[in-house]
Amino acid sequence: MDFTQVPPSYILGVLLSSTSILFCLKYLLRSGYRPPELPSGPTTVPLFGNELQVPKADAHFQFTKWAKQYGGMFSLKRYMNTTIVITDRKLMKSLLDKKSNIYSHRPASLVSHLITQSDHLLVMQYGEEWRMLRKIIHQYFMEPNCEREHWKVQEAEAKQMLHDFLTMPEDHMLHPKRYSNSITNSLVFGIRTATVHDEYMDELFYLMDKWSLVQELGATPPVDSFGLLRILPQWMLGNWKNRAVEVGDLMQALYSKVLDQVRARRQRGVYRDSFMDRVLDNLEKTPLTENQLRFLGGVLMEGGSDTSSSLILTIIQAMTKYPEVQAKAHAQIDAVVGSERSPSWSDFAQLPYINMIIKESHRWRPVSPLGVPHAVAEDDRVNNTLIPKGSTIVLNVWGMHHDPDRWSEPEHFQPDRFADYPALASTYAASGEWDKRDHYGYGAGRRICPGIHLAERNLFIGVAKLLWAFEFSEPLGSRSDISAESGASQGFLHCPKDYGCAIRLRAPEKRETIMREFEEAQGVFSRFD
């Protein structure tokens, strides 16, 4: 063949094609490969790495097994992605807290972007926008505001929760959800959730169930770490894109509707001291887009409604299985509070066992067993191993909470573990000492839950009142499933599955107190009519 006669365009095409093929081969050969400088981990296979070994649901169980084998920090290769799983509390402190400037980012996620357009604080990248929105939330929900004002709404809603458990015990799975949702919506929007059949509450928990499933680690095809998957028909990969878009549409519909109601009220000249009222009052000083406004209210509605209610339901279920714990709580409450009133936030220091029960519920059944993944913004070295820039950082909350070297018989509900932790969780989260942390139910680093002060009071007030009023037990002939493997919903957020519960009023005179306090709560509720 006379190559001198070959057109230059043909030669150029061959070179470009060859280069493309070589590039693709290099890409495919690198995919799934674990370089020796990474932390150790389970054996990889070409292309996939460890992707096929990562469970599609409840990965925290497998991650905890791997942590025992490979240590408190191990790595997974998921196609081109490097995932670092941390189960070591000391490492958690030294990386996420002490190096928070590089460990506060989120992994790039097409699914999260499809759902939220990257305006949701939970999945938003760390930067100026995140800091600005976080500051707005902090200013309203910081501890002095909870101590001075917000507790009044919490007390009133807890009084209704007692009334609802007394008069509608068959809806015991819904009352904690209404309680936490009404506190949140009242403070954020100035809108109460008056009944368990409230439209906004139904829509929120419906979308939260779907979002939890979509966001769970391993549940969605790894389209971010292996981009070629994006071009495949999505029906081959579980319709991942349609599922994400559906969740986004549900969020937009609900959050727009609630925001519109706030604006309509303000147009009628009715202003309230709610979070969203303050944000709208300050739009000239701190301008926000319409989408930012929707998701700013939405993220608070989600976080404030789901975590507290899931933990209260966990505690009630634990009381049915551990009657000795319930009896000890009853005895302490009875020694401090009579029948003429129910416990209040002012009783916190005198009821340390209630605080222990709450901490143990966080440890025993964490709402988010793997937290929300972080990402590292630049290369970092830990103990002579490399954590590459862009790596996904997973907090194995479950593994830390069920570490038998720290907690004896971790599968059992034993509140006395926390006898030496009398303060609120925020105190230990702020400690500079890694071994002083009580639990990781609120996350770690700069991404720690901004509503931690409100949530701690939600839980104490609600649980103290419920245990003052009632004795919870399993119905005759019925046994609820408290198994960690099968007793809770799947997703990145966990809640106990529906369970039966027999509810007995502890003393006849408490009925009168419950009804009277419910009537007194109407004075607070009238602010939201």
Curated annotation (Swiss-Prot):
Protein localization: Endoplasmic reticulum membrane
Glycosylated residue positions: N81, N383
Transmembrane segments: 9-25
GO BP terms: patulin biosynthetic process
Reaction equation(s) it catalyzes: 3-hydroxybenzyl alcohol + reduced [NADPH--hemoprotein reductase] + O2 = gentisyl alcohol + oxidized [NADPH--hemoprotein reductase] + H2O + H(+)
Keyword Zinc-finger in annotation: no
Cellular-component GO terms for this entry: endoplasmic reticulum; endoplasmic reticulum membrane
Pfam families linked: p450
GO molecular function: heme binding; iron ion binding; monooxygenase activity; oxidoreductase activity, acting on paired donors, with incorporation or reduction of molecular oxygen
EC number, UniProt record: 1.-.-.-
Keywords from the named record: Endoplasmic reticulum, Glycoprotein, Heme, Iron, Membrane, Metal-binding, Monooxygenase, Oxidoreductase, Transmembrane, Transmembrane helix
Use case: Patulin was originally used as an antibiotic and specifically trialed to be used against the common cold, but it is no longer used for that purpose since it has been shown to induce immunological, neurological and gastrointestinal effects. Genotoxic effects of patulin with dose-dependent increase in DNA strand breaks in brain, liver and kidneys have been detected in mice. However, more recently, it has been proposed that patulin might also have anti-tumor properties.
InterPro entries for the chain: Cyt_P450, Cyt_P450_E_grp-I, Cyt_P450_sf, Cytochrome_P450_fung
EC category: oxidoreductase
Cofactor or coenzyme needed: heme
Family: Belongs to the cytochrome P450 family.
Name assigned to this protein: Cytochrome P450 monooxygenase patI
Originating organism: Aspergillus clavatus (strain ATCC 1007 / CBS 513.65 / DSM 816 / NCTC 3887 / NRRL 1 / QM 1276 / 107)
